[in-house]
Structures are given as structure tokens and as C-alpha cells.
Amino acid sequence: LFDLVQQREEPIPFFAEMGSVNPVFILENKVKKDSTLPTALASSITLGTGQFCTKPGLIVICDSDPETEFAIHLGEAMDSLELEPMVHSKINKKYKQELNRLKNLKGKIHTHLCSNSVAALGLVSAKYFIETPNLSEEVFGPYSLIVHCQNMDEMLKVASCLSGQLTATLLSTPEDEQALRVLKPIIQSKAGRILFDGVPTGVAVNQAMQHGGPFPASTDSRFTSVGSDAIYRWLRPLSFQDCPNALLPEALQNENPFELQRRVNGVMTNTRL
């Protein structure tokens, strides 16, 4: 669609969301100290049968334990949930095709049949994830992939190899501040919204929301599709030079009838001129 728009005789802006795995980075202290994480993440992964664009489809954990119990507990939490059918049979068919492809992973994939859908959880090493770029592509449905990092250096490498995302989540403890100072700048270049100690599936409609991100999360990371600032997608800049006061829009007239905050000669003011 983007290519078609650019081929128009008069091209127009095109705003699209094209794919995001919404990575969740869990530092080792958090993995070991917060026993509620598997339940919270299982609910987020399977919300709406995994059909939310903000679903956490990638969970990057730092855990020195090679047989991480976190993956086992997350799989058990997903097993305990009953899921509704997906919204369309073709979507469900495509999802199952993706699961069959993922079964060839050099890792483990845990599946659980639920009504018309399959909740699934994969587990691979950081090294294999970095060497296999298509593992970072979105799988639409109740699936998530755990990437096991044995140390912080591996987590930083995983973060660096990711493409643009709608969201990225950092789960940590107060003791992890120094590690976050290194990780956060990498994440800032990858995502439109960064969460701390939460899950990304909730998208509030308010002035602060940013729902968009660097390519391929969206076609233009400067805009949001949710919240009051979403209106800017349908606006364009326009200036009036040496225009008679009476011909200006009311919001720009010297009298400032709406008492708006305006920048006049570099100073914010709501007074009349």
C-alpha cells in the first residue's frame, strides 16, 4: 500500500503499522525476585487471543541459570488460560502455519491447544536469536519467544539487533539502575513507547500516548495513531507572512479572542498584541 501511494500522480501521506514484537527485557534480579511475572505476562500475551498489536511477542531475560525456571512457569501460566477463537479462520490458519515453521527452532517450543487456537511459547539462546533474523518478526496470535541471555552483554547485543517497535518494556529492580543506564539508550532508538515495570497491551487514549515507532513498526515514527496528538496526521504546517490582521484565522489575530498561549517573538504569552 505504501508503494502504491507513492506511485500516485499526487502522493499523499500514508500511516500504517506493519509489525512489532514489543520486546520485554527482564533483568536477572527481577527474574529471580518477582514471582508474579509469569502470570502477568501470560495474561498479556494471550489477551484477545494474542491479536493485540502491542502483544509482548519477545521476552528477553537475563538469567545465569541455563535451565531457567522462568520459562517453565510462564508456560504453565499460559496453559492455565482458556482462549477464545481467533477473529477469522484465515488468521488462525496463518498462525498455525507460523507455529509449524517455528517448530524447527534450535531451541524448545511449548504448545498448548485451546479451543480453536494454540497458545505457544518458544525458548532460544541469545546467540541463536542473533544469528536468525526472522525470529524477530511478528507472529500474530497467542505466541511469544523467550530469548535467554546468560549475561548483560548478551542482552545488549539482542537489543541492538532489533528493528523498530511500537513498545519496549524494561522490568528491573532498584539495584539495576546502572544496567538500565546502558540498556535504555539502545531501547530509545528502537521503540515509540517505553514501559517500566508493566505490560504493553494497555493503550490509554490520552495526551501522553505515543502509538507508533521506527520502521517497520510504522511508516512514520513522528506520529501517533492513538491519543489527542493523532490528529496531527491530518494537518500540515501553514504560515501567513505580512497578512492583514482581519484576514488571519481568529486564533492568530492580534486580539487573541480565545486567550490561547502563543509564541510571539520567541516568548510564550496569551495576551493580545
Segments (PLM) and residue ranges:
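Conserved NAD(P)+-binding/catalytic subdomain of aldehyde/semialdehyde dehydrogenases
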Residues: 1-64, 110
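Active-site proximal loops enriched in glycine and acidic residues that flank catalytic Cys/His/Asp
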Residues: 16-18, 28, 63, 125, ...
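Short beta-alpha connecting loops at secondary-structure transitions
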Residues: 21-26, 141, 216-219
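NAD(P)-dependent aldehyde/semialdehyde dehydrogenase
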Residues: 39, 61-167
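Flexible, glycine/charged-enriched surface loops at secondary-structure junctions
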Residues: 49-52, 56, 83-93, 109-113, ...
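C-terminal core of ALDH-fold dehydrogenases
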Residues: 152-154, 160-248, 270
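Extended hydrophobic packing segments that form well-structured cores
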Residues: 248-273
